[in-house]
Amino acid sequence: MARYTGATCRLCRREGLKLFLKGDRCYTDKCAFARRGYAPGQHGQSRKKVSNYGLQLREKQKAKRIYGILERQFRGYYEEADRRRGITGENLLRLLEMRLDNVVYRLGYGNSRTEARQLVTHGHFLVNGKKVDIPSYQVSANDVITVCDKSKATEKFKTFAENPKTLPAWLSGNVEGFEGKVERQPAREDIDVPVNETLIVELYSK
């Protein structure tokens, strides 16, 4: 599947805020956004008046970059969200949150969604006892995600177990036990991404 392969730190600078795409590095002085908190390029420090379309576009780009998704797949998520009952913008964020790579990240495996995606691709996880190596796989309520037995003994997963994260309300389990469960679909208040999904819906609705 296609993915962005350029300079990650430029994405945060372009959006004007930290997207925490590099995990722990984003909390250190090495963070490029902390050192140069303006847009990249020759005219990055100049201030421009942003149109309504520009604001909508920036929100879409921000969401794509947070979840590591390119345009074609992102539009597919929007179209699916629009077909579902309920609020389209919230449906969109819920679909993104229920991706396996994001759930793995939320459970504490990986310092970033990029690392979590790599772990999924390399076949480290089981969903309901079956190996799944597709990052975009949509998990469902009551699904159980476990680490493969062979992977539990690796230094990487031992490190994750020693540094557990606080889980969101819609997930349960513990990283030390190498298991997590999707208790329910996330509500909007459970999704802590700095995105105004209404602007994204307005953009695609034109």
Swiss-Prot record:
UniProt entry keywords in alphabetical sequence: Ribonucleoprotein, Ribosomal protein, RNA-binding, rRNA-binding
RNA-binding listed as a keyword: yes
Domain of life according to the entry: Bacteria
First and last residue of the signal peptide: none
Cellular component aspect of the GO annotation: small ribosomal subunit
Chain ranges of the S4 RNA-binding domain: 98-164
SUPFAM superfamilies associated with the record: Alpha-L RNA-binding motif (SSF55174)
GO MF annotations, alphabetized: rRNA binding; structural constituent of ribosome
Gene Ontology BP annotations: ribosomal small subunit biogenesis; translation
Quaternary structure and partners: Part of the 30S ribosomal subunit. Contacts protein S5. The interaction surface between S4 and S5 is involved in control of translational fidelity.
Function statement: One of the primary rRNA binding proteins, it binds directly to 16S rRNA where it nucleates assembly of the body of the 30S subunit.
PANTHER family in the cross-refs: 30S 40S RIBOSOMAL PROTEIN, SMALL RIBOSOMAL SUBUNIT PROTEIN US4M
Family to which the UniProt record says this protein belongs: Belongs to the universal ribosomal protein uS4 family.
Protein name in the entry: Small ribosomal subunit protein uS4A
Native source species: Clostridium botulinum (strain Hall / ATCC 3502 / NCTC 13319 / Type A)
Top-level taxonomy: Bacteria, Bacillati, Bacillota, Clostridia, Eubacteriales
